[in-house]
Amino acid sequence: MWRLVRPDAKRAWSDPEVVRRLFRYRKIIDQERTAKYLLAKTLECDIPLDSSSEELWNVHKEDSQRFTQLLERVDSNDEVPGPVPGLERNFLNLKIELAQRILADCHFCERRCGADRTHDELGWCKLGSTSRVSSAFLHTGEEAPLVPSGTIFFSSCCFGCVFCQNNDISTNPNSGRVVGPEGIATIAEGLFRDGALNINYVGGDPIPNTHTILASQVHQTSNVTQLWNSNLYCSEETMQLLFDVFDVWLPDFKYGNNECAERLSGVKNYFDVVSRNHLIAYDSGEVIIRHLVMPNHVECCTIPILKWVSENMPDCMVNIMGQYRPEHRVRHEKERFSDIARPVTSQEMEIASNTADELGIYWRPVS
C-alpha cells in the first residue's frame, strides 16, 4: 500500500547514491545487519550501576569504544551475538542509569535548566519525570527512503519557535497520554509489525524524553532501525548516550547563525551547539538533514548552512524544505516578525536548490 501512496519511495532505492549513503539502514531493513540498540544489550558493563557519576561516565567512554569495535566485527562478519541471559549490567542499562542521573539535574538539552525532574520538578520543557505521547502511526509523509515510518510523537519541546507548525503539542506538555518505557516499546513493536521501516522518535521533540526512550529499548526486541528526529539541541552528554544506539539521524538545521535562532526560537549558542551535534551524529550513523527554507533568511541561514554541510558532512543528504508557512505567534504578531510573516517564494527556493547543486549536496531524492 505504501508504495502505491509514495511511488518515489520505491524509486529512491534504485538510486545508487541513496543506497550508498544509507547503506547500513538498508541492510537493517533487509535483516542483513543488526540495529545498534540490540547489540548494546549484548555488551557487558563491568561496573556496579550505583557507582559515582564520574566513574560511570569513565566506563561509558571505554565501553563506547568497545561497542564501536563490536559493531565493526559484527558488520564485517555478518555475525550477530545472541543476548546473554541475565546480563543486567549491559551497555544499554549503563546509558539508562546515566540518563536518570541527568534527569535529576536536567541537562538533556543545552538549556541546562537543572530541574530535578526525578521528583517531578518541571524543567524548561514543563515536563517532570513522565513522558506523554500525542500520537503514533505509520507515517507516509517522511523522506522517501524512510516511509512507511513508525512515528511516535512526544509532547513538549525544548525550543520556543515562534512559527511552530506543531505548536498544539510542542507548547502543551499535557497533550496526549502518559506512556512509560514498556508502553513505548509496545507501540514500537506494533508499528514494526504493521510494516514500519524504522521507529521514528519525534515531537515536539524527543530530547526531554531521552530517559523514557532509552528505557523502552530494554523492552523492544525487533531488529528495526532506531531513528532520532530532533532539533538536535542536545547537550553533549545526551549525544554520548544516543551515539551508540541510534542508527539513523533526522536532525533539523534551522539557522545559520546564533542571532536568528535566539530571536525566533529563544535558544542561545544555536549554531555552535547544533553544528557540534551534527558532527557527532555524522560520526555515529547515517544522516538526513532537514533544512526549512524561511522567507528573508536565505542569505543569513540557508546558504551558510549548506556551505557548512558541504564542507563538514559531504556524505549526508539534505531535505531542502519549502513548506514554511507563518503559524503560531507569527500569525498573530505579524509586525513583530515581519521578516517571516509570509510563505517562502519560488525564487528563494530556487536560490536554495541552486546553491545546493553548486556545492555538490545530494538533496533531490529526499526533498
Language-model-detected regions and their locations in the chain:
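N-terminal [4Fe-4S]-dependent radical SAM core
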Residues: 69-154, 167-173
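Flexible, active-site-adjacent loop/turn segments at secondary-structure boundaries
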Residues: 123, 131, 167, 262, ...
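Auxiliary Fe-S-binding modules of radical SAM enzymes
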Residues: 1-114, 282-287, 292-367
